[in-house]
A protein has these predicted regions:
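An alpha-helical, amphipathic repeat domain used for nucleic-acid recognition
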Residues: 1-162
């Protein structure tokens, strides 16, 4: 692998960061794959931040918006993905306003309706269990899922005890 100077690494990263929003960890991982030294990686990242190529808040807003609208992810899954990308929690906690609550609930409702059509069972309990697991895997909150499935707390407690 070629040894990159700071300037070469910076030029490559400015080009790469210009194509889409990137975060510190993505840039760092890419430079590490190229065997760039940690000292150079840190300098390049600082220069990218100073130049406006990397902005964690801007990245976070775009990430939340894209995963929510395009992938139909729930808030829990988005938060976990941002944690994996090492975005500080105080940054993504302030960015949830990108998600309109009514639209969020509408997307969950449509996902559950669509999934319901693909599940072949006559048992309501089994159907609800499968829908709950599906929506939880997509990162939606249990209370929101239950609300869309019209499961009352009393009925739910009785079903799970059987």
């Amino acid at each position: 692998m070629k040894d990159f100077t700071e300037e070469e690494a910076f030029e490559k990263m400015t080009a790469w960061c210009s194509t889409a929003e990137r975060c510190r960890s993505e840039v760092s991982e890419k430079l590490q794959r190229w065997s760039v030294s940690y000292a150079i990686i840190n300098k390049v990242i600082e220069r990218l931040i100073d130049g406006g190529y990397i902005d964690e808040e801007r990245y976070c807003r775009a990430f939340i918006r894209d995963k929510y609208r395009l992938e139909k992810w729930g808030k829990q899954k988005i938060a976990k993905a941002l944690y994996v990308k090492r975005i500080p929690q105080h940054i993504f906690d302030t960015q949830w306003d990108v998600i309109d609550n009514d639209e969020y609930q509408s997307i969950l409702h449509k996902l559950l309706q669509s999934k319901r059509k693909s599940i072949h069972t006559n048992d309501d309990k089994s159907l609800n269990e499968k829908l709950i697991r599906f929506a939880l895997s997509r990162g939606y909150d249990y209370k929101d899922i239950r609300q869309h499935l019209d499961i009352s707390e009393e009925l739910e407690e009785n079903e799970w005890e059987m």
